[in-house]
Regions:
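Residues forming the flavin
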Residues: 1-298
Length: 298
């Protein structure tokens, strides 16, 4: 269930072992976030199409536009692999959130990829940065994708804010090997044009005639936790307003919760671990395939 990287990896491995594999997905084409989340300037979509054709020729069945409820799985299968990702994005519930012009990042990214694939949308449904001052809230890869997409759509300016402090440019003594090195990452999207601001907490959205026109932010300070835990955030009282008529929320995703499944139901990818990297989703899908094979051969 789910034709993203985890589902495709699991399907491919199980098919190679001789099982009859059917992949269900709610979207109109396979790929998941590979197709609808990662911009075309980072991942050329014909690469996905070519791989899907190979998988179909090898015998894998794809049933698209199938929104399967994981609590009511389709009958007729010996095992199931839930690979539905992390569909719920983290929102920002501060005053003014209801204003027009504030969108979750994937609202824009998925729509842009569909437009480039030939789909059309009514004008009132378009999420476009053309001629606008864009503010991206969130400093991760999704935020970077919003920057590159906004620049390509013709934004007047793009600003990215992050609540965390700016990481060091080189090795961070706070994260020695073998920990994951927290250092400043500058992507090609940043290099194309973007202002980056750090240690800013969003207080409220400002509007005019029902549309967002700015964001009130406050400078924060981060101090070490004396007990050795996560750093402690402290407000400074220094408040400023950033002008914006398009705000994109790129603050990550919530880990999904699942009911207690039967023993023939397996979970893989972001659906199991929460939002992570594509390569980890692929590895998780392959492990799930191995576990399914072991279960079916007990």
């Amino acid at each position: 269930i789910g034709a993203g990287p985890a589902g495709l990896a699991a399907a491919n491995q199980l098919n190679g072992k001789g099982y009859t594999v059917t992949v269900f997905d709610k979207n109109e084409a396979p790929g998941g976030l590979l197709r609808y989340g990662i911009p075309n300037f980072k991942l050329h979509k014909p690469i996905i199409d070519r791989r899907i054709r190979v998988m179909e020729e090898e015998g894998i069945h794809f049933k698209m536009n199938s929104d399967v409820d994981v609590r009511q799985l389709p009958e007729g299968f010996d095992a199931y692999c839930i690979c539905t990702g992390t569909p719920t994005a983290r929102d920002l519930t501060v005053p003014g959130r209801e204003l027009k012009g504030i969108h979750l990042a994937l609202d824009m990214l998925a729509q842009q990829n569909r437009i480039l694939a030939g789909m059309t949308f009514p004008k009132e449904q378009l999420v476009t940065a053309k001629g606008k001052k864009v503010l991206v809230i969130g400093g991760g890869d999704t935020g970077s994708d919003c920057i590159g997409t906004s620049n390509r759509q013709g934004a007047v300016s793009v600003t990215q804010i992050e609540i965390m402090p700016q990481p060091p440019v080189r090795q961070n003594p706070a994260t020695p090997w073998p920990q994951f090195p927290i250092v400043l990452k500058t992507t090609s999207s940043h290099e194309e044009g973007c202002s980056r601001l750090w240690s800013l907490a969003t207080r409220k959205f400002l509007g005019k005639n029902g549309k967002v026109c700015g964001v009130e932010v406050e400078q924060v300070e981060w101090t070490p936790d004396p007990d050795g835990g996560r750093p402690v955030m402290k407000p400074t009282g220094k408040v400023e307003v950033i002008e914006a008529d398009l705000v994109l929320l790129a603050m990550g995703f919530l880990k999904p919760e699942h009911p207690q499944f039967a023993e023939n139901v397996f979970v893989a990818g972001d659906a199991a671990s929460g939002a992570s990297l594509v390569v980890r989703a692929i590895a998780s899908g392959r492990k799930a395939a191995t576990d399914i094979d072991s279960y079916l051969n007990k």
